[in-house]
C-alpha cells in the first residue's frame, strides 16, 4: 500500500491527503471574501485590509493589468517584498488566467535575465528601489511593461513620512522609460474609466 510512499505508514490516523475544491486561487479568495468579508486579510505596518476590500482591489488590479496588456496565458514577473501590491497583483494575474512568476526582489540583473527568459514574461511588477537591476536585465524578449510600486502607497501618513525620512529619500528616482507605469496610475486609470462608464449610462 505504501511501497511508493513509505513515509505514509508513520501517519497513523492522520489523513494522508485532503479534499481540495477544484477552484482557482482567485475563486478561493472570492469564496473567503463572501464567507468572512470583514476579516483582516493583510496587515502592513498597521495598515489593514479586509477580505472584501482585498477582493475589490484584486478585481481593480486585474482590470488595470489587462488594460496594460496582460492576457490569459501571459506571464507577470513579480519582484516584490512581502507587500500589498505583490499580493494583489498575484491574485489579479490568476483572475486573468495569467501566470504570476515570483522572484526574489534582490535578484541581480543576470538572474532576472534568466528568469525572464525561462518564464517568457513581458510584464513585470517591482518596487522603485529595485528598478535598476530589472531595467538592466537583457532577456531575449524585452519587457513591454514595467509597473513600479512604492512602499508608502499602503502606509499611514505618519509612517509614510517616517519611511521617506529614513529610507525613501535615498531611493533614486526612476528615470524616464516608455515602458514604465506607476502602480497608483494604472489603478487610478481603471477607476476613472469606471466613473466615465457610469456617467455615460
Task: Annotate the PLM regions.
Residues 2-19:
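Short, charged, surface-exposed hinge/linker loops at domain edges
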Residues 27-29, 62-65, 110-113, 131-136, ...:
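A generic local structural motif
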Residues 68, 95-185:
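Structural core segment of the AMP-binding/adenylate-forming
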Residues 33-38, 164:
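A short, compositionally biased
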Residues 19-21, 30, 38-71, 77-83, ...:
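Conserved AMP-binding/adenylate-forming core of the ANL superfamily
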Residues 41, 73-74, 101, 124:
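A local structural micro-motif
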Residues 14-23, 163-201:
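Flexible, low-complexity linker/hinge segments
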Amino acid at each position: 500500500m505504501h511501497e511508493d510512499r513509505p513515509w505514509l505508514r508513520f501517519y497513523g490516523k492522520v489523513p494522508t491527503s485532503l479534499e481540495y475544491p477544484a477552484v482557482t486561487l482567485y475563486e478561493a479568495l472570492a469564496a473567503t471574501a463572501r464567507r468572512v468579508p470583514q476579516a483582516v486579510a493583510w496587515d502592513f505596518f498597521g495598515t489593514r485590509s479586509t477580505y472584501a476590500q482585498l477582493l475589490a482591489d484584486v478585481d481593480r488590479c486585474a482590470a488595470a493589468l489587462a488594460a496594460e496588456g496582460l492576457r490569459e496565458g501571459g506571464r507577470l514577473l513579480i519582484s516584490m517584498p512581502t507587500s500589498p501590491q505583490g499580493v494583489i497583483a498575484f491574485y489579479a494575474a490568476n483572475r486573468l488566467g495569467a501566470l504570476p512568476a515570483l522572484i526574489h526582489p534582490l535578484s541581480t540583473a543576470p538572474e532576472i535575465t534568466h528568469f525572464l527568459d525561462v518564464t517568457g514574461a513581458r510584464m513585470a511588477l517591482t518596487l522603485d528601489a529595485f528598478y535598476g537591476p530589472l531595467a538592466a536585465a537583457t532577456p531575449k524578449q524585452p519587457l513591454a511593461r514595467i509597473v513600479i510600486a512604492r512602499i508608502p502607497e499602503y502606509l499611514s501618513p505618519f509612517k509614510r513620512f517616517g519611511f521617506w525620512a529614513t529610507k525613501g529619500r535615498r531611493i533614486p528616482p526612476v528615470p524616464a522609460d516608455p515602458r514604465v507605469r506607476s502602480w497608483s496610475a494604472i489603478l487610478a486609470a481603471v477607476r476613472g474609466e469606471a466613473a466615465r462608464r457610469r456617467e455615460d449610462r
